[in-house]
Amino acid sequence: MITDPLPAPRAILFDLDGTLADTAPDLAAAINLLRARAGLAPTPYDILRPTASAGARGMIGASYGVQPGESGYEALKDGFLNNYEAALAVESRLFDGIPAMLDGLSALGLAWGVVTNKAARFTDPLVGQIGLGAAGCVISGDTMPHPKPHPAPLLEAARRLNLAPEDCWYVGDDLRDIQAGRAAGMRTVACAWGYCGPVEPQHWNADHLLDTPQALLELVSTVVKAAQARQLAA
């Protein structure tokens, strides 16, 4: 069976927590500081880390067993977020291979941007402090009326880059990332190097499942160069 060649992307969009950056240490520190101030023992890091992509909801759920809408949640959320805002880039770092991958995308002539559900009060200072200041666009969880898995943030990112959604790929480590990307009409990549949460990424129906940032760069490079070769042969 003959299949159409894969169109080359013009931009790669990324989730932030668990995709570009390992922010779990600072998120865990913020929730455990809240516990310490209440005289409670810390929640083990290996329990907190897998929930990092879910932000406050994940941290509070894992540490206190309290969910949004339940009694006490909003007070816990306020305390956690205040702690996090005061120390959001102490231990957070880009994952190994991310800087080289981003440089490689730029060398291929591709734009790249960040689309996260993290609120702008945290996103804006964080991206500057951990080395993501060159992003072509940064869309936070409160930039649009609806966060992911709604497609609106991804569509806004494409608009800001002056690109059609189908010219963009979206890379994330959570099921909602893949749902948002598909709803926006973008090709989707699940990154297995991230936190990934309770549902295994092979069940997310992503177009690609990759283990390393280098694998992403290699895939994009192959697709871009194949498209360039087709243009030359036309």
Residue ranges and their predicted role:
Residues 1-10, 106, 120, 124-234:
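Asp-based, Mg2+/Mn2+-dependent phosphohydrolase catalytic module
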Residues 5-100, 106-108, 121-124, 132:
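N-terminal helical cap/lid subdomain that shapes the substrate entry/recognition surface
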Residues 111-113, 187:
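Proline-centered loop/turn at the N-terminus of a beta-strand
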